[in-house]
Amino acid sequence: MLRQLKLTLNISRWIFMPWQRHASASSSQVPPFLAPISDDVIVDYEDPDYLPLPEYPVRPNEPLETRKQRLLYQSRKRGMLENDLLLSTFAAKYLKDFSAEQTAIYDQLINGVSNDWDIYYWATEVKPTPEEYNTEIMKLLKEHVKNAERVTRFRQPDLT
């Protein structure tokens, strides 16, 4: 009976904990996905050269109000919660007062970058901003992210 229980435990360990298949009973091997991650580590891989980056279509004849409405929508629907909160609150606060040139710069910022994590790391100043994106709008976004007014941003602002 004891032998049968031991065999069952070994088989279940082999099935449900595959990282311990070759580990001895005394070792405390931790699977890579359960290993602790320190706060100062950024997991960021360079894009391979063979990966084509999509080009964002230029819309030269788009009216300014239509562009602002599109950018407001795109600021809210980024695909990652961090940027959804940062960019939607930024757009709600500043986008309505942007000139045509500032709106074009903001459009290039949020749609010209192929990786949303880059925008997040630049805005939070974890990584340096490339020169082409280090504009007045990015500086304004960085100030917005610092949140000097200590505004609570648990949700996106209401659409008006």
Curated annotation (Swiss-Prot):
Gene Ontology, cellular component aspect: mitochondrial matrix; mitochondrion
Transit peptide residue numbers: 1-23
Keywords linked to the UniProt accession: Chaperone, Mitochondrion, Transit peptide
Subcellular locations according to the entry: Mitochondrion matrix
InterPro entries linked: SDH, SDH_sf, SDHAF2
Transit peptide is among the record's keywords: yes
Coiled coil, from the record: none
Stored SUPFAM superfamilies: YgfY-like
Keyword Mitochondrion: yes
Highest taxon of the lineage: Eukaryota
Gene Ontology terms describing biological process: mitochondrial electron transport, succinate to ubiquinone; mitochondrial respiratory chain complex II assembly; protein-FAD linkage; tricarboxylic acid cycle
Role according to the record: Plays an essential role in the assembly of succinate dehydrogenase (SDH), an enzyme complex (also referred to as respiratory complex II) that is a component of both the tricarboxylic acid (TCA) cycle and the mitochondrial electron transport chain, and which couples the oxidation of succinate to fumarate with the reduction of ubiquinone (coenzyme Q) to ubiquinol. Required for flavinylation (covalent attachment of FAD) of the flavoprotein subunit of the SDH catalytic dimer.
Similarity field: Belongs to the SDHAF2 family.
Subunit structure: Interacts with the flavoprotein subunit within the SDH catalytic dimer.
Protein name: Succinate dehydrogenase assembly factor 2-B, mitochondrial
Source organism of the structure: Drosophila pseudoobscura pseudoobscura
